[in-house]
């Protein structure tokens, strides 16, 4: 088998693992990693989007604001959580919690797992684009440490709205891209059946993105994927979070914000 075919197969296999219905979701990781978690609801404007969960958590007697884009564990829950595709009120809820974290000086931990923001007409009417854009602006200047972890799919602006952070991590078999391989193949090649080929061309794997310095670290998964040993995966994430916080401890606010800003300004130089 040629090297290019191997790369194509590897990328598509990671897409399939990232989308595996048994893969642990944000809710699982929050409950497993943190000692306590109190969920907060609503955007104080329209409603409570179940695709995004968030609240206040304790870990080693330290307080955090934790936000996650969450898929369901079965069909009924997936319908409830809109298959992990947030509405604008979900992003506004997330922003409300981020600003609350800033007020009380709590670090923010985000878990990302979405094929993309919901693109229905209702979401557009309620300002989906504006909600995502506002999150990008506010996260860039948020005056507390921010850590974001892509645990499955990281699709487009819907993922980026929770992934402007001081430290961005990806699980070993997660993916992060501007759109799905199927969408890429449909738009560029007018043939969605070439999705497997697109997955390789798009450079969407954690390994690709680390090579471009778009992410900071790859978190190793158990053999076969996170769903093969969810507890071990949660332990690996917990260890990585604590290490990252230790690295940022003592960093003054101006330095933190400047490094975050430069991190994103410099991405184009690495491509």
Curated annotation (Swiss-Prot):
Keyword Ligase listed: no
UniProt GO BP: fatty acid biosynthetic process; malonyl-CoA biosynthetic process
UniProt keyword list: ATP-binding, Cytoplasm, Fatty acid biosynthesis, Fatty acid metabolism, Lipid biosynthesis, Lipid metabolism, Nucleotide-binding, Transferase
Matching InterPro entries: Acetyl_CoA_COase_a_su (IPR001095), ClpP/crotonase-like_dom_sf (IPR029045), COA_CT_C (IPR011763)
Chief place of localization: cytoplasm
SUPFAM superfamilies: ClpP/crotonase (SSF52096)
Reactions mediated catalytically: N(6)-carboxybiotinyl-L-lysyl-[protein] + acetyl-CoA = N(6)-biotinyl-L-lysyl-[protein] + malonyl-CoA
Sections of the chain in a coiled coil: none
Domain CoA carboxyltransferase C-terminal intervals: 1-247
Gene Ontology cellular component list: acetyl-CoA carboxylase complex
EC number: 2.1.3.15
Location in or out of the cell: Cytoplasm
Top-level enzyme category: transferase
Claim: ATP-binding is one of the keywords in the record: yes
Entry-linked PROSITE patterns: COA_CT_CTER
Pathway per the UniProt entry: Lipid metabolism; malonyl-CoA biosynthesis; malonyl-CoA from acetyl-CoA: step 1/1
Top-level division of the source organism's lineage: Bacteria
Disulphide-bonded residues: none
Stated role: Component of the acetyl coenzyme A carboxylase (ACC) complex. First, biotin carboxylase catalyzes the carboxylation of biotin on its carrier protein (BCCP) and then the CO(2) group is transferred by the carboxyltransferase to acetyl-CoA to form malonyl-CoA.
Alphabetized NCBIfam families for the sequence: accA, AccA_sub, PRK05724.1
Family stated for the protein in its record: Belongs to the AccA family.
Name the record gives this protein: Acetyl-coenzyme A carboxylase carboxyl transferase subunit alpha
Gene transcribed to yield this protein: accA
């Amino acid at each position: 088998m040629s090297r290019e075919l191997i790369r194509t197969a590897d990328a598509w296999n990671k897409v399939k693992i990232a989308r595996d219905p048994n893969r642990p979701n944000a809710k699982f990781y929050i409950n497993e990693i943190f000692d306590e978690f109190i969920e907060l609801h609503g955007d104080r404007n329209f409603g409570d989007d179940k695709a995004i969960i968030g609240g206040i958590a304790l870990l080693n007697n330290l307080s955090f604001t934790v936000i996650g884009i969450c898929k369901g564990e079965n069909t009924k829950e997936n319908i409830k959580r809109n298959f992990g595709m947030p509405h604008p009120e979900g992003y506004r809820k997330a922003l409300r919690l981020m600003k609350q974290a800033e007020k009380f000086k709590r670090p923010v931990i985000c878990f990302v797992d979405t094929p993309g923001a919901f693109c229905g007409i209702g979401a557009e009417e309620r300002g989906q684009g504006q909600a995502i854009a506002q999150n990008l602006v506010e996260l860039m200047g948020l005056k507390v440490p921010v850590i974001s972890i892509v645990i499955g799919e990281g699709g487009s602006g819907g993922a980026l709205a929770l992934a402007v952070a001081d430290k961005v991590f990806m699980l070993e078999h997660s993916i992060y891209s501007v759109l799905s391989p199927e969408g890429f193949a449909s738009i560029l090649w007018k043939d969605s059946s070439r999705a497997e080929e697109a997955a390789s061309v798009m450079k969407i794997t954690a390994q690709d993105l680390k090579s471009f310095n778009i992410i900071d670290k790859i978190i190793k998964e158990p053999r076969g994927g996170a769903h093969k040993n969810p507890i071990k995966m949660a332990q690996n994430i917990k260890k990585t979070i604590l290490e990252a916080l230790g690295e940022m401890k003592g960093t003054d606010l101006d330095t933190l914000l400047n490094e975050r800003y430069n991190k994103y300004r410099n991405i184009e130089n690495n491509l």
